[in-house]
Amino acid sequence: QGNVTTAPIRSDDGEAEPELATGDLNILLLGSDSRALESDGFGEDDGTERSDAMVIAHISSDNTRIDAVQLPRDTLGDLPACDDNGRGSYDGGFGMLNSALQYGPACSVAAVEQLTGMTIDHFVQMDFEGFIGMVDAMGGIDVCLPEPLQDGHARLDLPAGAQSINGDQALALARTRHALAEESDIARLGHQQMVLSAIVQKATKSDVLVRP
């Protein structure tokens, strides 16, 4: 419906159609920090794009099991040289894993493959606006917070306890760092995992999957 675009997963793929999968699949999920919603208070667009969240989802060949591993975005390492179609090129160098996305998703794929030794078969990239729209289209998600959370930087203000949250609140919960005592990326991963788990639980309900 015009909301989904495709791109080669590797710089040398060109216009090749993806092959039909016959074995296990590794899919890289990228949450972009693109400031598409600058006017709504999500911060200024500094002209770059990084991955706020990175998850490798492994799907077994018989479709009976899905395992997910989250990668800390501040992971430091040697990023490989990369030529991404439509984004220019990167000569490689030492840097944070999340910075590879500014050169395009194929460069993020190359960086994750070098770090993990895994082969990534596909990727899915979503920005702030897409994430909010997805959660709202599902009718919100259910979470349970052990304590209230407030973070003006992420526009987060949630009470403690079980509650249903909308797309804006889910994004704020996944992004908050200042609401946590540690204010670290590792601490933030816990909230991202909570949000992702709630999305999966909501999406797998039969009444959600049959909605147009």
Stretch-by-stretch model annotation:
Residues Q1-P212:
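Non-catalytic, solvent-exposed segments at the cell envelope interface
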